[in-house]
From Swiss-Prot:
The lineage of its organism: Bacteria, Pseudomonadati, Thermodesulfobacteriota, Desulfobulbia, Desulfobulbales. Transfers the gamma-phosphate of ATP to the 4'-position of a tetraacyldisaccharide 1-phosphate intermediate (termed DS-1-P) to form tetraacyldisaccharide 1,4'-bis-phosphate (lipid IVA). NCBIfam families: lpxK (TIGR00682). It catalyses: a lipid A disaccharide + ATP = a lipid IVA + ADP + H(+). This is Tetraacyldisaccharide 4'-kinase. Belongs to the LpxK family. The gene is lpxK.
């Protein structure tokens, strides 16, 4: 039995209590007893029902890039997990310059800011204050609420809920006895579902989670998010490259390390070693030295990590070439239209 399963078994008696508290919280927002903040621009929430990684960051990146390409000024609003900036509103990027470090901003907001020139990125515990600042002070035209499904203090015009293709709804129990942040009734708030981590060859194949969602909420559109082979970023050369040595050592500190491992194997890399750290891992010089030592011992010709990890370690020198993997994200037909239609119809 895995450690997670043991913890879920211990926490199972409290699941009903936690689910009840979350349901009451939702009801209080719905009845207006808890204030929900509305804004004069479209708000798109990207979130999930389950704990762990479902690919929210790539989808957030995709939406922001799409909006920018259509002449709209997006602002990504994040809680800023693991970031050390303690202000109510922390401007990671004003769209022109990156103003905070990865340590201050948190790894995911910093990564989004570094990869999305022209996009505003703000963090803060009270996200409605960040939304207010983005609209009033920075002229944001669309708000993208990162990890926003449970953040009911901000009203939204489109609620996107993501599920991992392999793990689905986990064990179908609510925390602390399972993977769910809320009971399944919460899916009634969703406007669309995205199934992440599918292979393009599975496009016509309906997975168990898709059949489940279509049965329970047939009125809700369902989209597939594909991760296909992309490019790699060289930390030393500071540019994108397409060819790497095949004998590599890989490491990451993300919520779903198995997916990263699988992606590398699928691309034909021979992994001499793989090390998975906890999500939002803070790396030290000693930690990087140990990674390099292990990689050299295995005969690796290069080290590969994720963009999320690279932004936290680019100040450390490594004896072996260091790269980050950048898979391409594509989303099934009509998703772009849904996003743009939501923005175009706002206020009608």
């Amino acid at each position: 039995m895995q450690k997670k399963d043991i913890l879920f078994s211990i926490g199972w008696p409290l699941s009903s209590l936690y689910a009840g508290i979350m349901k009451l919280r939702c009801l209080l927002y719905r009845r207006g007893l808890f204030r929900q903040h509305h804004f004069p621009v479209p708000v798109i929430s990207v979130g999930n029902l389950t704990m762990g990684g479902t690919g929210k960051t790539p989808v957030t990146h995709y939406i922001a890039k799409l909006l920018l390409e259509h002449g709209l000024q997006p602002a990504i609003i994040s809680r800023g997990y693991s970031g050390k900036s303690g202000g109510e509103v922390n401007i990671v990027s004003d769209g022109q310059r990156i103003l905070l470090s990865a340590e201050q901003a948190g790894d995911e907001p910093y990564m989004l800011a570094s990869m999305l020139a022209g996009v505003i990125v703000i963090t803060g515990k009270k996200r409605y204050l960040s939304c207010k600042y983005a609209v009033e002070k920075m002229q944001a035209e669309v708000i993208i609420l990162d990890d926003g499904f449970q953040h009911l203090a901000v009203a939204r015009n489109l609620d996107l809920v993501l599920f991992d293709a392999q793990t689905g709804m986990g064990n179908n129990r609510v925390f602390p006895g399972g993977d769910l942040r809320e009971a399944r009734f919460a899916l009634d708030r969703a406007d669309a579902f995205l199934i992440t981590g599918k292979c393009p060859r599975e496009e016509e194949e309906l997975l168990a989670i898709e059949l489940e969602l279509q049965h329970e909420l047939p009125q809700c559109p369902l989209f597939s998010v594909y991760r296909t082979e992309g490019v790699f970023y060289s930390a030393k050369q500071e540019k994108v490259v397409t060819h790497l040595p095949k004998k590599v050592f890989a490491f990451c500190g993300i919520a779903n390390p198995e997916r990263f491992h699988h992606d590398l194997e699928k691309q034909g890399f021979s992994l001499v070693g793989f090390k998975a750290f906890s999500d939002h891992q803070q790396y030290t010089g000693q930690c990087i030295e140990e990674i390099v030592k292990e990689a050299k011992k295995g005969g690796a010709q290069a080290i590969i990590t994720t963009d999320k990890d690279l932004v936290k370690i680019d100040s450390f020198a490594t004896e072996l070439p260091l790269y980050s993997a950048r898979p391409r994200t594509t989303i099934s037909t009509d998703f772009d239209e849904l996003i743009l239609k939501t923005c175009a119809s706002f206020g009608e």
